[in-house]
Design a protein with these regions (language model features):
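Membrane-anchoring alpha-helices and their flanking helix-loop junctions
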Residues: 1-79, 96-157
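Histidine-centered phosphotransfer motif of kinases
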Residues: 80, 84-93
Length: 157
């Protein structure tokens, strides 16, 4: 085991811990900002949709689900369901939740939302390197499937 891979579990725990802290910071209740009421409702809908997306994607992984970017021993390369639209649907849901919280809580949530975005982007890149090593088909999947935001596809007539 080389020096770099020996530290991966510790780095993974640190990343997951930071993610938990940032999500707590986003979820912490605050007095509503002076945004228009409609904007706050849009934020609530976005946050709820983000939770649903993350939850459905997590359930789809079944026993292979792990908060760590290190793939579990039961991990398989998933190309179906939400994983056919984006490579990281759980992270996509969390990013949508963070954007929604910005609309419902205002400036008080900018720092945790930006930090969460940067952390999830870094975790995704790390996870993709590990998945490429473990699954030979991963690079072709990554080349055709967006990371976080689904591509708009034209309908065929």
């Amino acid at each position: 085991m080389d020096e770099r891979s020996r530290h991966q579990p510790c780095t993974a725990v640190a990343a997951v811990s930071a993610q938990a802290i940032l999500l707590t910071g986003l979820a912490w209740p605050v007095r509503p900002p002076p945004h228009p009421r409609t904007l706050r409702w849009i934020g609530r809908v976005m946050s709820g949709a983000g939770l649903v997306i993350a939850g459905v994607a997590a359930a789809g992984l079944g026993p292979a689900l792990t908060p760590s970017p290190l793939p579990s021993t039961q991990a398989q390369l998933r190309r179906d369901g939400m994983f056919g639209r984006v490579r990281h649907p759980i992270y996509s849901g969390l990013l949508l939740l963070g954007a929604g919280r910005l609309l419902t809580a205002g400036r008080r949530r900018v720092a945790p939302a930006v930090a969460l975005t940067l952390l999830l982007a870094a975790k995704a890149r790390w996870e993709e390197r590990l998945m490429s090593t473990r699954f030979p088909d991963y690079p072709s999947y990554a080349a055709t499937t967006p990371r976080f935001i689904p591509a708009m596809r034209r309908s065929r007539k």
